[in-house]
């Protein structure tokens, strides 16, 4: 049973470096579509902007790690051209899980939960998670998170 996320920051940093390490800035006006993301990267010599919100309940102890994960994820959007809509996020979650296996099965499942799992939650509730830690622990421990939607 998984109880915490110790060591996750180092793994996120290694994955970010291994898969592109695209420079990024944290910005409330981050792109939310593939065309906007492509334009942003083109205008800024490869730098992308990522959304800063939602870090309060993230599984990462430091918001900077959450942002680094987001930068890696958005870079994957840029590379694959998979959309920011629910089907695109679920598809990208599957794709990112497949490449995250390089850093271990647990990290790959965390990546899948962070992307596809949260997209599935949003599709079911119409809202973002209020408690990412509880959701991720239940997801990874194979709890029936669908039955506990109000918990998150």
Model regions and ranges:
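Anionic, Ser/Thr-rich low-complexity intrinsically disordered regions
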Residues: 1-152
């Amino acid at each position: 049973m998984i109880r915490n996320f110790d060591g996750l920051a180092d793994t996120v940093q290694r994955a970010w470096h291994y898969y592109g390490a695209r420079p990024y800035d944290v910005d409330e006006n981050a792109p939310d579509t593939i065309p906007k993301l492509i334009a942003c990267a083109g205008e800024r010599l490869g730098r992308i902007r990522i959304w800063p919100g939602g870090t309060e309940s993230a599984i990462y102890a430091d918001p900077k790690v959450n942002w680094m994960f987001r930068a890696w994820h958005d870079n994957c959007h840029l590379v694959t051209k998979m959309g920011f809509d629910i089907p695109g996020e679920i598809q990208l979650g599957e794709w990112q899980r497949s490449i995250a296996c390089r850093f271990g099965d647990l990290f790959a499942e965390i990546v899948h939960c962070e992307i596809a799992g949260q997209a599935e939650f949003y599709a079911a509730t119409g809202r973002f998670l209020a408690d990412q830690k509880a959701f991720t622990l239940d997801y990874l421990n194979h709890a029936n998170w669908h039955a506990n939607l109000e918990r998150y």
